[in-house]
């Protein structure tokens, strides 16, 4: 029974694969024939992607970029703050600081 089910499943996989490939090839030929444009009057009845993409893809005006501002609100020098800090911390074995 199991062998019979495996045969049926393999048959369905092959059938689905065959029809998928056939549909893909037919779709590719349809797209190629549409882009070759053998009959230009075909495009006068509808707005297809081939022509509307060109019309909508053209930029009417170029975008303008604003100049960036590089001003800091407040300048903090981390190194100077560490060197000039009054808070002196001792090591773990240092004598206590009584000042």
Curated annotation (Swiss-Prot):
Name the record gives this protein? Uncharacterized 11.6 kDa protein in scrR 3'region
Q: Could you tell me which species this protein originates from?
A: Vibrio alginolyticus
The major lineage groups are: Bacteria, Pseudomonadati, Pseudomonadota, Gammaproteobacteria, Vibrionales
């Amino acid at each position: 029974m199991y062998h019979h089910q495996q045969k049926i499943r393999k048959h369905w996989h092959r059938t689905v694969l065959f029809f998928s490939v056939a549909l893909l090839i037919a779709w590719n030929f349809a797209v190629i024939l549409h882009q070759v444009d053998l009959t230009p009057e075909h495009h006068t009845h509808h707005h297809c992607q081939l022509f509307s993409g060109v019309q909508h893809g053209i930029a009417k005006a170029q975008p303008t970029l604003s100049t960036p501002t590089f001003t800091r609100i407040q300048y903090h020098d981390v190194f100077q703050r560490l060197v000039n800090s009054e808070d002196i911390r001792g090591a773990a074995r240092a004598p206590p600081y009584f000042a």
